[in-house]
C-alpha cells in the first residue's frame, strides 16, 4: 500500500474543493484493503453545516458504504492534521491508522486556527467562552427513566 498515493488524493480533494468553491482546503478518504471506500471534502460553507469537515464527511460516507459505524479495518488519509471535532469522530469510528499531510499549524497559517478549541477543552465548563452548565434536576430525571 502506497501511503503517498492516498495522501496525494486527499490533497487533490482539498484543492478540488477550493477550486469548486465547496468549502475550505481539506480533503479526506477512507481506504480498506488498499481500495478507496469513501471520500470527503470540506463542505461547511455550501451546506451551512459546521460539522461538514472532510474527515467527518469521509467517515459518514464510509460507514454508509460499509454498513457499519466502526472502521476498524480501514485507514483514514487526510490533507491536514484533524481538528478536535474530527479527532473525536475518528476515535469513535476507530480506524486502524490515520495519515495526514499538513500539520494543524499549517492550517492556522491559512486562517483555520483551531488552537482555541484545545484551550477551551482544558478549561472548567463554567469558564469556557461558551459556558456549559450541568442542570442537576435533569440528571435526576435521567436516572429515574433508566
Give the ranges of each region predicted by the language model.
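A short, polar/charged loop-to-alpha-helix boundary motif
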Residues: 46-56
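Short beta->alpha transition motifs characteristic of CBS
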Residues: 37-44
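Zinc-dependent deaminase
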Residues: 1-19, 82, 89-146
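Helix-adjacent hinge/juxtasegments
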Residues: 52, 59-93, 97
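A short helix-loop-beta-strand connector motif used in the catalytic cores of GNAT acetyltransferases and
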Residues: 20-24
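Residues that line or immediately flank small-molecule/substrate-binding pockets and catalytic motifs
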Residues: 44, 78, 102
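Short beta-strand scaffold segments in enzyme catalytic cores
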Residues: 25-34
Amino acid at each position: 500500500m502506497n501511503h503517498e498515493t492516498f495522501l496525494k488524493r486527499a490533497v487533490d480533494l482539498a484543492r478540488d474543493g477550493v477550486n469548486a468553491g465547496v468549502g475550505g482546503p481539506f480533503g479526506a478518504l477512507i481506504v480498506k484493503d488498499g481500495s478507496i471506500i469513501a471520500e470527503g471534502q470540506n463542505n461547511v460553507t455550501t451546506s451551512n453545516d459546521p460539522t461538514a469537515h472532510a474527515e467527518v464527511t469521509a467517515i459518514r460516507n464510509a460507514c454508509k458504504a460499509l454498513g457499519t459505524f466502526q472502521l476498524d479495518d480501514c485507514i483514514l488519509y487526510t490533507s491536514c492534521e484533524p481538528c478536535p471535532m474530527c479527532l473525536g469522530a475518528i476515535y469513535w469510528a476507530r480506524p486502524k491508522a490515520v495519515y495526514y499531510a499538513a500539520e494543524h499549524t499549517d492550517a492556522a497559517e491559512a486562517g483555520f486556527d483551531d488552537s482555541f478549541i484545545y484551550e477551551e477543552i482544558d478549561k472548567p465548563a463554567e469558564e469556557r467562552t461558551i459556558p456549559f452548565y450541568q442542570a442537576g434536576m435533569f440528571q435526576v430525571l435521567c436516572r429515574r427513566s433508566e
